[in-house]
């Protein structure tokens, strides 16, 4: 299993976090620590080849116990095909979780807004 580390960058002045090329068979997406500089609200885009998999955005305050993030309408941030959601999050950590499917290769791109 390969660990997929989040990549942090500033794109056009906006903080962005990415996990690229996640597969269910070989990869573990690592957590991202949310700080004041990296936002309190944001949008997430799921893209790539899903191959029957489901991608969910999760949060945790201890980095061990994870729960699904809800969007602004209270719906779980989860997709089986290319999708985009807006969310707020005050948890200490966030990460994507890819389950099921095969022959998948998914990118997760988050733009964070807040105190930066």
Sequence positions of predicted segments:
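Transition segment at domain starts
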Residues: 1-38
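Generic structural motif
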Residues: 4-8, 55, 108-110
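Beta-sandwich interaction modules
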Residues: 30-37, 70-116
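A short beta-strand element within beta-rich, extracytoplasmic domains
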Residues: 38-49, 96-98
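Residues that flank catalytic or metal-binding motifs in active/ligand-binding sites
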Residues: 40, 53, 92
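Extended, low-complexity, turn-rich repeat/linker tracts enriched in Gly/Pro/Ser/Thr and Asp/Glu
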Residues: 46-54, 100-106
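Conserved Ser/Thr-centered positions that define the repeating blades of beta-propeller domains
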Residues: 58-60
